[in-house]
UniProtKB/Swiss-Prot annotation:
Note describing how the cofactor binds: Binds 1 zinc ion per subunit.
UniProt name for this protein: Cysteine--tRNA ligase
Binding site for Zn(2+): 29, 214, 239, 243
Residues at which ATP binds: 275
Organism lineage: Bacteria, Pseudomonadati, Pseudomonadota, Alphaproteobacteria, Hyphomicrobiales
Taxonomic source organism: Azorhizobium caulinodans (strain ATCC 43989 / DSM 5975 / JCM 20966 / LMG 6465 / NBRC 14845 / NCIMB 13405 / ORS 571)
Length: 462
């Protein structure tokens, strides 16, 4: 199959050709670890996990290196640690553990490397020294700044007019800047802030600017030029634009990454997510009501480059879909080895710029094929293997049911008692009471199923 990816840099969908097929290199901007990750943070994690899985299938697990950084030096971190009266290290360790657990619950593989910014200060200092030596950066009042006019191609990624870039850069036009667009590579630390020995002969301790961190970590773990750089569309400018400027000028190279991929924004019930609107929701909060696999499928139901409208209806539909798919596979194991046509069909669809909605539509078709009364267990195993490529159906039906029950607050004994009351009401022909009990349970996401043998079973749909 041919992998085609949309490249933000070229504004086109092109065939992917790795620089080195023996080592495909992927870098994705990771979290700033100061608080629980929200559902918008989950989108790039899930999207690029699917890409990681697809690359591993195409080139081999030992021939792909996925790096996702951890930003553990930031003004938000400093403020939150002070607010909670704990050390910065305690805060970042705690928050990273939350993030790691949340993404595992979403079915995401761990990246090969998760570098921390604070462990790469030397690389940042080395890059800054290079940029100053080559005339692309300068020292001013204990700051080091990148001089944007020194790079004629600046703005090629975002393609914004200069005045729009200046408004969107969210930088102070300090009097010591040579140009209003110049951005900080290094800044002085005040008392109580983390600090390190400064580069370029600056006497006072300082700390890195945001953009230099990713340039340094990608260089350290992937080299001067690598294959794919990913992140949310909100990072195109200024973050990724500035990364390109720093890295290209430091190494005098034609590119930093061959392909730049960006996932779209997330809305909640049609509105921008914000605490002021009362619709701000963390991954952890959602995991108290839904299994992570449900959230994953709901996220993948929209193409990654399109805005996604996160709704309870969409989550409910994903839950019902997984209920059906797990009924189809039962407790079979996925088919291993090569030659699975179902998996190849899903890979082909994902190969078209990670077209996950198309892949999910085809999984519905494959589920119908595997559900047919004449379907063999081999078809069910193939169907499960195909879904595995998207990080889905990694459990058996028995495990799924148990996890589904554990994800929400239900009392099986209380449900059994209500079912007994309903059966008694039906036997007494008190259908109004029987219907009321069914509706009461349905409002909690519990669906009753009257079986041919006279028994009643139930399942969660949320």
């Amino acid at each position: 199959m041919e992998l085609r990816l949309y490249n933000t840099l070229t504004r086109s969908k092109d065939a992917f050709r790795p620089l080195d097929p023996n080592l495909v290199r992927l870098y994705v901007c990771g979290p700033t670890v100061y608080d629980h990750a929200h559902i918008g943070n989950a989108r790039p994690v899930i999207v690029f996990d699917v890409l990681f899985r697809l690359l591993r299938r195409l080139y081999g697990a030992d021939h792909v290196r996925y790096v996702r950084n951890i930003t553990d030096v930031d003004d938000k971190i400093n403020a939150r640690a002070a607010e909670r009266s704990i050390s910065i290290r305690e805060l970042t360790e705690e928050t990273y553990a939350w993030f790691r657990d949340d993404t595992a619950a979403l079915g995401c593989l761990r990246p090969d490397v998760e570098p921390r910014a604070t462990e790469h200060i030397l690389e940042m200092q080395a890059l800054i020294e290079r940029l100053v030596a080559s005339g692309h950066a300068y020292v001013a009042e204990e700051h080091v700044l990148f001089h944007v006019p020194s790079m004629p191609e600046y703005g090629k990624l975002s393609r914004r007019p200069l005045d729009e870039m200046l408004n969107g850069a969210r930088v102070d036009v300090a009097p010591f800047k040579r140009d209003p667009m110049d951005f900080v590579l290094w800044k002085p630390s005040t008392e109580g802030q983390p600090g390190w020995p400064s580069p370029c002969g600056i006497a006072t301790p300082g700390r890195p600017g945001w953009h230099i961190e990713c340039s340094a970590m990608s260089w350290r773990h992937l080299g001067e030029t690598f294959d794919i750089h990913g992140g949310g569309i909100d990072l195109v400018f200024p973050h990724h634009e500035n990364e390109i400027a720093q890295s290209r000028c430091a190494f005098d190279s034609g590119s930093m990454a061959q392909v730049w991929m960006h996932n779209g924004f997330l809305l909640v019930e049609g509105e921008k997510m914000s605490k002021s609107l009362g619709n701000f929701v963390t991954i952890r909060e959602l995991l108290t009501d839904w299994p992570g696999e449900v959230l994953r499928l709901a996220m993948l139901s929209t193409h990654y480059r399109q805005p996604i409208n996160w709704t309870r209806q969409g989550i409910g539909f994903a839950a019902k879909t997984l209920d059906k798919w797990y009924r189809v596979i039962g407790d079979v194991e996925a088919e291993t080895g090569e030659g699975n046509p179902f998996e190849s069909e899903i890979a082909d669809r994902l190969g078209d710029d990670l077209n996950s909605p198309s892949a999910i539509t085809h999984l519905h078709h494959l589920a119908d094929v595997a559900e047919h009364e004449d379907a063999s267990s081999a078809l069910k195993r193939r169907f499960k293997s195909a879904a595995n490529l998207m990080g889905l159906l990694h459990e058996t039906e028995t495990e799924w049911r148990a996890r589904q029950r554990a994800a929400v607050s239900v009392d099986p004994d209380a449900i059994a008692a209500l079912i007994a009351d309903r059966n008694a009401a039906r036997k007494a022909r008190d259908f109004a009471t029987a219907d009321h009990i069914r509706e009461q349970l349905a409002s909690q996401g519990i669906v009753l199923m009257d079986n041919k043998d006279g028994t009643t079973s139930w399942e969660l749909t949320r």
